[in-house]
Every structure is written in structure tokens, then in C-alpha cells.
């Protein structure tokens, strides 16, 4: 035991103080979040992380979660402080509050639901204050209050009362320790507490944390600012030079060789396995407060720090580090160089130098510190260049050689930008120096550099110079173009031509010249160009198409053939793929906006040490580690919100863990939403802390979007006025190395409006069928009614038509009658005329006959008169006039004469004439004239007719004839 004590004394007391005071050369990036950002109280007491990468903070206002983009808070039912946290293998979140403890787990709609365990505590132990420690051990979860430790196993809680007062509880490896005021340090074994150290160094000693330090060695820190080493049940106080006498409430292991402790005086200390502080991170290094209440190391080796004024994250595990030579007065890093096992850094105010550890792959992990090189301040130090085994410094004051601790002036010309060797043979005997006001020669002879004088005619500022295989010097000017310079053998005479846009450059502005793969390359606003001597013009390079469209300001090739570059916005590397003979462009989002825009610098020392000029010092990238430790990113669906007059959270970020341990949406959780919920906002994230704000997302709403969206750094998507149907929102994330995550999906259904639902459609079908039935029924009735109306109408029409016909017929009859009447009238007139003609002729003939009878003469004359008289009688008896008369008479009297002849065949021609005359109401006298008989003869003839015709005694002959 004495031997061990001596050994520990030697280790912790004899170690050189200067070494202990040094830090790792490279600082990790520190980001801070105040309570306005995370939406909680100013004090955080504990930090944990689940299997998906989501962080949990026990805060003075409850439980706070952070998924890389979004902060959320959950209060306890009694709205008290959460002092302690623990997350088990099933991602159940156990919390210890004030007067209560329990757990959070996913509930409906993806939110966290709190379940109190207080009801399981025996009644007599339910009165307790704060739960200061919560952790799992074996199959149990332990909760430490001041007076009692509760052990949850299954659905039962066992009680471990304090003998006096429980000061501490913590797990170290496979052991659970607790400190009791009376019984000292105890270990939990076989369901009871066994003593480890019954007697502590002093009575009021209170343990704050216990950390494993190598095999079977535990560092014990107390609230009384004391630090001890526990080994083999022996507690030894550590040297104050190793451990600060400060309040150390929290500690966490980083890896097998380092751990972090939270310190009340200086913030965080990173310590190695021997207990030595290798890095201090306090307010100067970026923390907002040095009073640390909790520290936690996440899955990516980031250190999360809870302090009085907020939450900080230290990107300790990152391959990117920051070399800041002067934390009190920040300087811009302009150039860097490794020379003689020292890192030289030229800045906006002099040169800083730091020793680096030999044999250490990652030089930023050297235990060292920067110091200002003597007399190098007072202006910008633009250039560090090794030439012929000498270290040259291009300074605002001129060109110098750094030798030992002195600056040897080589040129007093103001402002040296660069030094270009004019041959590749070692040692270089001559170089060209670009200055603020032209070009100058630098000669090397007998191990000494001397100025060769200025080249006359060059008065411009030349920051970039390169030499090609034809010994042509190319110099770029920021706003004029590119100079092509050929020196004569004496190096003083030269031929210089200014080449501009007219010679193929995309612009006269922002052109820079570099040498890549032994070829002169011109970086422009539109990509990379080369010079074609056959065309005497600049042409876009076919070898570097990946750079097309980029505004390149700086290029540097590394030993692996990768091309590091700076644009006007970021720094990246074109990683060469030897298999495909192509480049993959990789950006570094961690340092976006930090490089020295306009005065860029990249030093590709090797794959473990890439130095980049920054606004604050130099950025160091261990590129090999950066690539090797890159992990496939994880995407999280943080929230789904239905947008309406009052937004509704449909999903709050937590899927259910299935049997395979994968988080996914269960079928029972797939919502069917009313049609009014047709506008949504999806929020997503990735817990890739350090670059989480630069991750790119792609999404698709299956059922609406035809394709995946383009990659962009936007962590939310909204949809409005979606139609009813089934949808699946899916999202994935891509990091800067083009690694793509698995897809996370969320299924939901928008139901049709009630008037388009299945039941509504069934009702519509029934109503439609009923409507059709009623329609046809009504139509049938209407048709019948219309048919009746039609028939009635048709009857009316037929009646009207009949009337029309009858009317027409009557009209026709009338017209015919009128026509007949006209014809009768005409014929009557003709008949009357004929009758009058007959009467007149008859009378005339009678007069002629009478006159002839009066004539007396000779016998011969008497014979002639007799003959004439006979002729007259023949005329009177001529039937020609009668035939015409009979024809007209029958037409006017409906065939009167024909009827008489047919009905009374015994009637003679004269009988018919007499009947016709009687029908015409001729008088007896008129008839006698027409018949050329006497009146008496007419009367006799009438008498005979009465006999021939069956005329009654009481009926006149005229009436009888009129009835025929």
C-alpha cells in the first residue's frame, strides 16, 4: 500500500507543471443556446440521449427535447423542476422531479405522455423533496432523494432509507455506488448496500461525481472542491496541479482515454486517463457561462454543457478544429507552414508559432500553445514559404527570412504577397517575388538570399504567380485580367501581355492563377479555364467540369490528388475518384462563412492535417478522420400539423418501436381525417449535431407529388387544399458527403366530405334509385295525363279539323252552289232567253202566218202561200231549239225531264214540253203560243197530263211537277 501511495505521489506531484498548463492546440467549435431558443428555464440539471439521437434536458421548467432542429418542452403535472434523467434500453425516459418521479413514453399522435410512479411508493415514504439522481442498474431503476433511494423493479418499488442522509448515487462501470452521511461510500450488491469506505477523509465530505479512470481506478470529486483517486478501497487526494479545487458537479466519459468534467470556476476540463487536464473550455473558448451544472457526451462525441445561462454544445468529436493563437485579441489566419516541428501561422498581426508533437498524426491534438514570434507584429504577415530549406516570411513590411528567433530582412519593399521559384532544381537559385507595387527578383547564392532588384515596368500588385512548362509566368490581376510574362535570359528584359475577356476569359474580374497537376489553371467566375497555345486563347477546362458555374477564388492540390478550393461562400474539396477518374465535390458546412474571403489560404500538409485560413485564426481538418467517421445520417419526422383556423398537431415526433427495435408508424396510428383538414405542414430534422443546420432534405407526398423534391436545406413543407384520398408523406436527408438516410414515412387519409362519404353515396344511390323510380312513375302519370290531354287535344283537333273540313266542304258546297247558282242563273237566263226567243219567234211566226192569210191572190200565189205556211209550221215544229232548251232545263232542274220520262214512259214529246213549261210557271197562253195551239188545246192537254200523271184531285198539276 505504501508503494502505491508513493507511485501515485510521483505520478501526480512530479509531472512537469509546464506540460500540465498546456492545452490541445486545436479548439473544438462551441455553439450556445439560450433559454429564448430552447423555450425553458435558465438552469438545466441533467442531459441524456435516446437511441435515435434525440437529446433530453432536465430543466427548471420541465423536460426539454432537441432533435437537431426543433426544441420542445413537456412539463410535469406539478410543474416542478426535473433534477435528473435516465433513458433505458427501450428509450423510456425516467425523470426525477420535486415530490414526484416517473417516466415519459410515446403516446397517441406521437407525443410524450408522463406517467407518475408515486402511487407505487409505500404510503409512509411518499413525502420527499428532490430526486437528485436517476439511473438504471441491472433490471431496476433507482431514484435518489435526500432521505431515501427508491428502486423500481417491474411494477413494484422497494425503499432504501438513508441511515442519516443520502449524499450521492452514481454508476461506474458495472457497479452502483451511493454515499450515506453516516455509513460512508456504499456499493449495491445482491440487493443490499455494502460498505466500500466506511470512513471518509473528513466528516462533511460530499461526493459530487465518480468517474472511471483506467482499469479499477475511479476519480472522486466532491462538492467541497476536493478530488480523490479510489483504488482497491483506498482513497488518495490528488495533486491540485492536476485537479482544480473547484465545485465539480458533473462528469462524463468521452472515450477510453479522455473524459470531461464540469467545473464551477473555469467551465469544462478535458482530462486524459492519467487525470491531466489537456484542454480547458471556458468563456474565452466560447461558453456563455463557466458555472457548469451538467455535462453529457452524445453518440457523436459532442459534449453538451448545462450552465446558468443556457445550454452549450462542444463539437469535441469533430474532425474540424480551430487554431486561435490569440483568444484575447483575435487575428485572421493568412498562411500556415510546418517547419522544424513547429507550426507557423501568419496572421493579420504578425506570426505565431507553436511546437507540435512528434509522431502525432493529428497535429491539432498536440499539447502546445501559440506564442507571437518576436518583432513580427505591426502588420499583416501574408506568406510563409519554405525555399531551399529556409523559412521565408512575406510581410506588410517586406520580405524576411525567419531564422531561430530573428527576422532577417531580404527586401524592404512594402508588401510581399508571394515567392515563385523560377526553376525546379534544388537549390533554387532565383525566384520572383510578387509585391504591392510590382515584381522583384530574389537570388540565392552560397546559402544566402539577396534581392535581385525590381523588374521595371511592373507597377501592379501581384498576389498570384505561377510558372508553366514553357517558362511562361502567369500573373493574375483582380480587375484587369491575366498577364502572360516571358523573361529574357538575363531575367531583366521581358515580354508582358495583358489577356482579357477578348482572349476567352468569361470576365476581366475575379481571375486567379494556380498550378494543379503540373498544369496552369485559371479560376474564374464561371469555373476553371486553361490556356490553349495553339488558339492563343483561354478555353474552359474539360478536366474539371465539376467546377463549372462556381466562382473559384483559391485552389490547392493535396498529395492524394484531391483539389481543395474556396468559393465566395464556402470551402470544399474535389475528392478524386481513381476508379471513375472524376471528382466528387464535398463542402464543409461546419466552417461555412468562416474563411477569409478574398485572402484565402489552404495548406494541404497531409490527409490528417489540412490548414485553412479563417477570420479567427486557422481551421484544421483531419480529412482522413472526417471521411472515416462519417455516419449515414438519420432523418426524423418532428411534427405534422393540420392547418386550419385553429391548428391541430396530428403527430408530435414519436413513432412506436416495433419488435425489431425500429421506430415506425403503426397501422392503428394512421389517421383518417375529416375533409376540413386538407392543409398540412410537415416538419423534419436530423440529429447530426454540428452540421444539423446544413443538412439537405428531400420529400414526397405519395398520392399528390409525382416525384421526390430537389435537395434543399429546408426542414419543413406545407401542402394546402389537398383532395380526399390516401397519402404517404416520406422524407430523407443527405449530408455533405452525399450519404442518404433511410426514408421515414407518415400515412394518413383525408376522408371525403360527408356528402361524398360511402354512406352518403349509398344514400345517394338509394335516393337516385328512388328518384328514378319516382321520376318514371311521375313521368308515367304525366305521360298518361299528357296522353289524355293529347287524345283530348287530338279529339279537339279532329273535331276542329272536321269542322274545318265541314266548313271547307260547306264553303266548297257554298262556292259550288254559288257557282251552280251562277250557272243556273246563267242557264236560267239562257233558258229564259231561249223561251223568250221561242215565244218571240212563235209570235212572229203567227203574225207572219196571219199576214199571209190576209193575202189573196191567184191560185199560183195561193199555192205558194200554202207552201210558205207549211214551212212556217215546220219551223214551229223544229226540235233544234227544243233540244237545247231541254238540255239546259234538265241541268237546272236536276234531270226533271229525264225523271219524268223514266217514271212515266207514256209521256210524249209534247207532254214533256208542256210539263217543262208548267215547271217554268208559263201561263196557258204562253204555252199555247209555244205549242202553236189554242188555249183550249192547252187546257185539254193539261187534262190529259193529269190522267197520265197520277195527280190527285186536290193537287194542282204545277205542284205535282214541282215536287219531282
Task: Describe the residue ranges of each PLM region.
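Basic, Lys/Arg-enriched C-terminal extension of HTH/homeodomain DNA-binding domains
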Residues: 943, 947-964
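Cytosolic signal-transmission helices at domain junctions
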Residues: 321-325, 760, 773-846
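Conserved beta-propeller blade signature
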Residues: 54-57, 92-94, 140-143, 175-178, ...
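Residue-level detector of Asp-centered blade-edge/turn motifs that repeat once per structural unit
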Residues: 49-52, 87-90, 136-138, 171-173, ...
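Short loop/turn segments that connect beta-strands within beta-propeller blades
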Residues: 67-70, 106-109, 152-156, 188-192, ...
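Helix-turn-helix DNA-binding segment
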Residues: 876-877, 883-940, 959-963
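Loop/turn residues immediately N-terminal
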Residues: 60-64, 99-102, 146-150, 181-185, ...
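Residue-level "micro-hotspots" composed of small/polar
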Residues: 21-49, 76-81, 103-132, 164, ...
Amino acid at each position: 500500500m505504501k508503494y502505491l501511495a508513493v507511485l501515485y505521489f510521483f505520478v501526480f506531484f512530479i509531472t512537469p507543471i509546464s506540460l500540465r498548463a498546456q492545452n490541445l492546440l486545436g479548439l473544438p467549435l462551441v455553439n450556445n443556446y439560450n433559454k429564448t431558443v430552447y423555450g425553458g428555464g435558465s438552469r438545466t440539471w441533467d442531459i441524456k440521449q435516446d437511441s435515435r439521437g434525440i437529446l433530453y434536458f432536465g430543466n427548471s421548467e420541465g423536460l426539454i427535447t432537441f432533435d437537431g432542429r426543433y426544441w420542445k418542452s413537456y412539463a410535469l403535472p406539478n410543474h416542478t423542476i426535473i433534477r435528473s434523467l435516465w433513458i433505458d434500453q427501450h428509450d423510456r425516459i425516467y425523470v426525477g422531479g420535486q415530490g414526484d418521479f416517473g417516466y415519459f413514453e410515446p403516446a397517441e399522435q406521437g407525443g410524450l405522455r408522463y406517467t407518475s410512479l408515486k402511487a407505487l411508493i409505500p404510503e409512509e415514504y411518499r413525502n420527499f423533496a428532490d430526486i437528485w439522481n436517476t439511473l438504471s442498474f441491472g433490471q431496476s431503476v433507482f431514484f435518489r432523494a435526500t432521505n431515501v433511494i427508491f428502486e423500481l423493479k417491474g411494477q413494484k418499488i422497494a425503499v432504501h432509507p438513508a441511515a442519516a442522509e443520502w449524499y450521492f448515487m452514481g454508476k461506474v462501470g458495472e457497479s452502483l455506488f451511493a454515499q450515506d452521511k453516516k455509513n460512508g461510500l456504499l456499493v449495491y450488491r445482491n440487493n443490499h448496500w455494502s460498505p466500500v469506505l466506511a470512513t471518509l477523509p473528513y466528516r462533511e465530505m460530499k461526493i459530487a461525481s465518480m468517474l472511471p479512470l483506467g482499469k479499477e481506478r475511479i476519480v472522486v470529486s466532491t462538492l467541497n472542491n476536493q478530488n480523490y483517486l479510489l483504488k482497491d478501497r483506498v482513497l488518495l487526494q490528488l495533486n491540485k496541479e492536476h485537479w482544480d479545487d473547484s465545485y465539480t458537479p458533473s462528469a462524463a466519459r468521452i472515450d477510453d482515454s479522455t473524459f470531461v468534467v464540469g467545473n464551477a470556476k473555469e467551465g469544462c476540463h478535458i482530462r486524459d486517463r492519467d487525470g491531466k487536464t489537456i484542454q480547458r473550455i471556458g468563456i474565452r473558448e466560447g461558453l456563455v457561462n463557466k458555472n457548469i451544472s451538467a455535462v453529457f457526451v452524445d453518440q457523436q462525441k459532442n459534449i453538451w454543457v448545462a450552465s446558468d445561462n443556457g445550454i452549450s454544445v462542444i463539437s469535441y468529436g469533430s474532425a474540424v478544429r480551430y487554431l486561435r493563437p490569440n483568444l484575447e485579441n483575435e487575428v485572421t489566419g493568412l498562411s500556415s507552414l510546418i517547419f522544424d516541428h513547429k507550426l507557423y501561422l501568419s496572421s493579420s498581426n504578425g506570426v505565431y508559432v507553436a511546437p507540435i508533437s512528434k509522431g502525432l498524426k493529428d497535429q491539432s491534438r498536440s499539447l502546445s500553445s501559440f506564442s507571437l514570434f518576436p518583432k513580427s507584429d505591426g502588420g499583416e504577415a501574408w506568406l510563409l514559404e519554405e525555399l531551399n530549406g529556409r523559412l521565408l516570411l512575406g510581410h506588410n513590411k517586406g520580405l524576411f527570412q525567419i531564422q531561430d528567433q530573428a527576422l532577417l530582412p531580404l527586401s524592404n519593399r512594402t508588401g510581399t504577397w508571394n515567392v515563385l521559384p523560377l526553376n525546379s532544381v534544388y537549390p533554387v537559385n532565383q525566384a520572383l517575388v510578387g509585391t504591392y507595387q510590382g515584381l522583384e527578383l530574389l537570388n540565392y547564392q552560397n546559402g544566402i538570399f539577396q534581392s535581385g532588384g525590381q523588374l521595371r515596368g511592373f507597377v501592379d500588385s501581384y498576389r498570384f504567380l505561377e510558372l508553366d512548362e514553357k517558362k511562361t509566368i502567369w500573373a493574375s490581376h483582380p480587375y484587369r485580367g491575366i498577364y502572360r510574362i516571358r523573361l529574357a535570359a538575363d531575367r531583366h528584359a521581358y515580354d508582358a501581355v495583358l489577356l482579357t475577356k477578348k482572349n476567352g476569359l468569361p470576365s476581366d474580374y475575379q481571375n486567379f492563377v494556380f498550378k494543379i497537376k503540373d498544369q496552369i489553371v485559371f479560376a474564374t467566375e464561371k469555373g476553371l479555364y486553361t490556356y490553349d497555345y495553339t488558339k492563343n486563347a483561354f478555353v474552359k477546362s474539360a478536366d474539371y467540369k465539376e467546377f463549372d458555374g462556381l466562382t473559384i477564388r483559391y485552389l490547392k492540390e493535396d498529395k492524394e490528388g484531391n483539389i481543395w478550393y474556396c468559393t465566395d461562400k464556402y470551402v470544399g474539396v474535389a475528392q478524386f475518384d481513381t476508379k471513375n477518374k472524376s471528382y466528387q465535390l464535398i463542402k464543409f458546412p461546419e466552417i461555412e462563412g468562416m474563411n477569409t474571403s478574398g485572402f484565402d489560404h489552404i495548406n494541404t500538409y497531409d490527409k490528417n492535417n489540412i490548414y485553412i485560413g479563417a477570420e479567427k485564426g486557422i481551421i484544421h481538418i483531419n480529412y482522413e478522420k472526417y471521411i472515416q467517421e462519417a455516419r449515414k445520417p438519420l432523418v426524423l419526422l418532428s411534427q405534422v400539423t393540420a392547418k386550419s383556423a385553429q391548428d391541430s398537431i396530428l403527430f408530435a415526433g414519436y413513432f412506436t418501436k416495433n419488435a425489431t427495435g425500429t421506430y415506425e408508424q403503426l397501422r392503428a396510428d394512421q389517421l383518417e381525417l375529416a375533409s376540413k383538414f386538407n392543409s398540412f405542414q410537415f416538419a423534419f430534422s436530423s440529429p447530426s449535431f454540428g452540421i444539423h443546420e446544413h443538412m439537405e432534405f428531400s420529400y414526397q407526398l405519395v398520392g399528390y407529388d409525382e416525384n421526390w423534391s430537389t435537395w434543399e436545406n429546408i426542414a419543413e413543407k406545407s401542402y394546402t387544399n389537398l383532395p380526399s384520398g390516401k397519402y404517404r408523406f416520406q422524407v430523407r436527408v443527405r449530408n455533405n458527403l452525399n450519404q442518404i438516410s433511410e426514408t421515414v414515412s407518415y400515412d394518413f387519409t383525408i376522408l371525403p366530405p360527408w356528402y361524398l362519404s360511402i354512406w352518403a353515396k349509398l344514400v345517394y344511390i338509394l335516393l337516385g334509385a328512388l328518384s328514378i323510380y319516382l321520376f318514371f312513375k311521375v313521368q308515367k302519370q304525366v305521360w298518361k295525363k299528357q296522353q289524355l290531354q293529347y287524345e283530348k287535344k287530338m279529339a279537339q283537333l279532329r273535331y276542329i279539323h272536321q269542322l274545318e273540313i265541314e266548313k271547307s266542304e260547306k264553303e266548297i258546297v257554298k262556292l259550288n252552289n254559288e257557282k251552280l247558282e251562277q250557272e243556273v242563273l246563267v242557264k236560267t237566263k239562257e233558258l229564259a232567253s231561249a223561251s223568250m226567243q221561242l215565244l218571240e219567234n212563235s209570235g212572229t211566226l203567227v203574225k207572219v202566218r196571219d199576214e199571209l192569210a190576209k193575202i189573196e191572190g191567184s191560185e199560183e200565189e195561193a199555192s205558194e202561200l200554202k207552201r210558205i205556211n207549211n214551212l212556217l209550221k215546220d219551223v214551229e215544229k223544229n226540235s233544234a231549239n227544243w233540244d237545247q232548251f231541254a238540255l239546259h232545263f234538265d241541268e237546272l232542274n236536276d234531270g226533271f225531264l229525264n225523271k219524268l220520262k223514266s217514271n212515266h214512259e207514256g209521256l210524249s214529246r209534247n207532254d214533256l214540253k208542256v210539263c217543262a213549261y208548267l215547271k217554268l210557271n208559263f201561263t196557258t197562253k204562253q204555252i199555247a203560243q209555244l205549242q202553236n195551239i189554242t188555249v183550249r188545246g192547252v187546257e185539254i192537254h193539261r187534262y190529259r197530263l193529269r190522267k197520265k200523271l197520277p195527280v190527285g184531285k186536290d193537287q194542282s198539276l204545277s205542284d205535282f211537277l214541282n215536287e219531282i
